[in-house]
A protein has these predicted regions:
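Conserved catalytic/switch belt of AAA+ P-loop NTPases
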Residues: 179-190
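Conserved small helical "lid"/interfacial subdomain of P-loop NTPases
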Residues: 223-250, 263, 268
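P-loop NTPase nucleotide-binding core
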Residues: 45-177, 191-194, 201-203
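C-terminal helical "lid" of AAA+/P-loop NTPase domains
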Residues: 252-256, 263-278
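Winged-helix-like regulatory helical subdomains adjacent to P-loop NTPase cores
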Residues: 269-340
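A short, basic N-terminal segment
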Residues: 1-54, 73-79, 84-86
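Short regulatory helix/loop adjacent to the ATP-binding pocket of P-loop NTPases
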Residues: 203-218
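Short conserved motifs of the RecA-like P-loop NTPase core
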Residues: 180, 245-257
């Protein structure tokens, strides 16, 4: 990890900017995770309450996967200060990414495949048999396909553990229904392990089948678009890590263009730093660098943007107004709750 406010050479700065601004991949470390503290604490609260589980949902691009990624380091960090040493010793935090072809059993097999037992203690990660490890499913003598009761019995022996299923919106409806049954069962038996479901959805009902039957057993975490001050934290973090300074005008411009979506803050922030390097103006980043960044970001996604524009405006009717309507939407003053 680079020291705070360390000055880098221009070439190093252009390279290191990509370690702080990460538009292509979700954030995976707590020190680069900005905003969403309230939502993260809500997940931690669910972990600390037996029988309670969490569902993280919202539109695409608001940072759901990044939030899911920092659950593990946050929980493990809190363990250092928590009083429940027994749970902390046995706790594991495991994540998998669901696919459209996944069943209830295949998802849990993927989660359990990462866990081995050594001297009756769960350990996450690949290791050789020489270490005396025993795969979790082998230790419990459970065969595929796994049932709700199979999973319940295993989780009962992993107190305080967290199992995260990302992209849950992709699973078949039948799989979603079985997860609802599992959460209800875990709650009824007060099993002290937490299931966290993450997916793209406007409402929890679109993501979790028959959610009304488990409403008391789930903490519903809707990820709204980020507030301007939360997006500004991303830029503040970059300033400390890279030793650069965004002018107030540049920072406000980036935040406004991002429209609450952290992906764009990372994307424009990255190219702004590199634009400043090319202009020979680091560590100061001004509005001109932001405009150059927009040109570069647009250039890199030009073909996909053209394709989306073509699909949105195509019509067999000459009098269709799709193009001017789309242009009007683009130039209209954007507000957080604006229908546009």
């Amino acid at each position: 990890m680079a020291p705070m406010n360390q000055a880098f050479s221009p070439n190093d700065l252009a390279t290191r900017a990509a370690t702080v601004f990460q538009p292509r991949t979700p954030i995976a470390t707590r020190d680069l995770f900005a905003g969403r503290w309230d939502e993260l604490i809500t997940v931690a609260d669910a972990v600390n309450q037996p029988g309670l589980h969490a569902v993280i949902y919202g539109e695409r691009g608001v940072g759901k996967t990044s939030l899911a990624n920092v659950v593990k380091p946050t929980i493990l960090a809190l363990d250092e200060f928590g009083p429940d040493e027994a749970n902390a010793k046995l706790r594991v935090v495991v994540k998998t990414v669901a696919t459209s072809g996944d069943s209830f059993s295949s998802i849990w097999e993927n989660l359990f495949r990462d866990i081995n037992l050594i001297d009756d203690s769960p350990v996450v990660g690949f290791m050789s048999a020489a270490n005396g490890r025993v795969p979790l499913l082998e230790a419990y003598g459970v065969d595929s396909p796994l049932t709700v009761d199979d999973v319940r019995r295993i989780l009962s022996n992993l107190p305080g553990s967290v199992f995260i299923v990302d992209e849950f919106d992709r699973v078949p409806k039948e799989t979603s229904k079985t997860f609802t049954d599992l959460i209800k069962t875990l709650s009824d038996f007060s099993v002290n392990s937490t299931v966290v479901l993450v997916g793209v959805s406007d409402t929890i009902g679109q993501l979790v089948s028959d959610h009304a039957s488990i409403v008391r057993a789930i903490s519903q975490i809707f990820l709204r678009r980020m507030l301007p001050r939360e997006l500004k934290v991303i830029l503040d973090t970059a300033e400390k890590r890279l030793g650069v300074k965004f002018t107030d005008e540049a920072a406000q411009l980036i935040v406004h263009i991002s429209q609450g979506l952290p992906h764009y803050t990372h994307l424009i922030g990255l190219h702004s730093v590199r634009a400043a390097v090319r202009q020979g103006s680091p560590p100061n980043i001004d509005r001109n660098d932001v405009f150059k960044a927009l040109e570069e970001a647009t250039k890199q996604s030009e073909q996909s943007a053209r394709d989306r524009h073509s699909r949105a405006t195509h019509s067999s009717h000459k009098e269709a107004l799709y193009r001017p309507i789309l242009l009007a939407c683009a130039v209209a003053a954007a507000q957080q709750h604006d229908a546009l």
